[in-house]
C-alpha cells in the first residue's frame, strides 16, 4: 500500500490546495461521483483508511468527495482511479450511470445510432486549473478516447500509479503541450503525438498563451488506467 502523499516538495504544495477542496461546479454530477466512489469502495470492502492508504489521498478528502461537498482535482482523481485499477474516464463515466439510465428521462434517438452530440456531451472540469475533459468514446467502446483542454499557463500532474495500463497515446490538436514523463520533458506541437511506456509520474503543462487541446487514447488492459 502507498503512503499518504502530502508533504513532498512542489507536489505537496499543489496537493495541499487540492486537499482543501472546492465547491462543486455541478452539484448533481458531484453527488453522482461521490456515490460512485462510495460504491467502488464498498464493493472492495475498504474502509476510508484503506482507500487513503491505497491512493495517497487523505481520509478527510475522500469523505468530502463521497458526500458530494468537495470536487476533487485532476491529481486526486488520478490517485483514486489508480487505487481502483480504473482509468479516470471509467471512474467519471460511472458517475453518470444513474443519470444515463434514469427511468424518467425520454429515450434519445441518437443512442440507437451511436451519435454523441457535442451540445449534450458530458465533461469534467478540474476546479484547481480549469483543465477540462470530454469523453469521446462510450464506456462500452474497447478503448478510452478523451478530449482534453488545458488552459494557458496551467499544469496537471498524475502519479505513476495512474499509468499502469496497456497502451497510452497522446495527440495534440491545437497549441503546444509540455509533457514531463518521469522527469524528462518533451514539447509537442499541433499534430504531434507520443506513446507512453512504463508507468511514471507525468505532468501536462501549457506554457503558451493560448489553450492547448489534445486527445488521449488509452487501450485498456487487465488493470487499465488513465
Question: PLM ranges: what are they?
Answer:
Residues 164-182:
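Glycine- and acidic-residue-biased ligand/ion/polar-headgroup-sensing regions
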Residues 182-199:
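Short acidic-glycine-tyrosine-enriched beta hairpin
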Residues 145-149, 195, 200, 208-225:
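A short hydrophobic beta-strand segment most commonly corresponding to one strand
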Residues 179-180, 187, 202-208:
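Short beta-strand His + acidic residue motifs that chelate non-heme Fe in jelly-roll/DSBH
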Residues 35-52:
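Short basic helix-loop element that most often maps to the first helix and adjoining turn
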Amino acid at each position: 500500500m502507498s503512503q499518504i502523499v502530502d508533504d513532498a516538495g512542489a507536489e505537496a504544495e499543489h496537493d495541499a490546495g487540492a486537499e482543501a477542496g472546492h465547491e462543486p461546479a455541478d452539484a448533481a454530477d458531484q453527488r453522482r461521483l461521490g456515490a460512485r466512489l462510495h460504491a467502488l469502495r464498498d464493493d472492495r470492502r475498504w474502509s476510508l483508511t484503506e482507500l487513503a492508504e491505497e491512493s495517497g489521498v487523505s481520509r478527510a478528502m475522500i469523505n468530502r468527495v463521497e458526500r458530494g461537498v468537495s470536487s476533487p482535482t485532476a491529481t486526486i482523481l488520478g490517485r483514486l482511479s489508480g487505487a481502483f485499477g480504473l482509468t479516470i474516464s471509467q471512474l467519471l463515466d460511472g458517475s453518470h450511470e444513474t443519470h444515463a439510465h434514469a427511468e424518467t428521462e425520454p429515450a434519445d434517438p441518437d443512442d440507437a445510432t451511436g451519435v454523441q452530440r457535442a451540445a449534450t456531451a458530458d465533461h469534467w472540469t478540474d476546479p484547481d486549473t480549469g483543465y477540462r475533459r470530454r469523453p469521446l468514446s462510450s464506456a462500452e467502446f474497447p478503448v478510452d478516447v478523451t478530449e482534453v483542454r488545458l488552459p494557458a499557463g496551467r499544469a496537471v500532474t498524475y502519479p505513476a500509479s495512474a499509468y499502469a495500463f496497456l497502451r497510452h497515446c497522446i495527440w495534440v490538436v491545437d497549441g503546444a503541450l509540455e509533457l514531463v514523463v518521469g522527469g524528462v520533458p518533451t514539447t509537442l506541437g499541433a499534430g504531434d503525438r507520443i506513446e507512453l511506456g512504463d508507468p511514471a509520474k507525468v505532468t501536462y503543462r501549457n506554457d503558451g498563451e493560448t489553450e492547448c487541446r489534445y486527445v488521449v487514447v488509452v487501450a485498456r488492459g487487465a488493470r487499465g488506467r488513465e
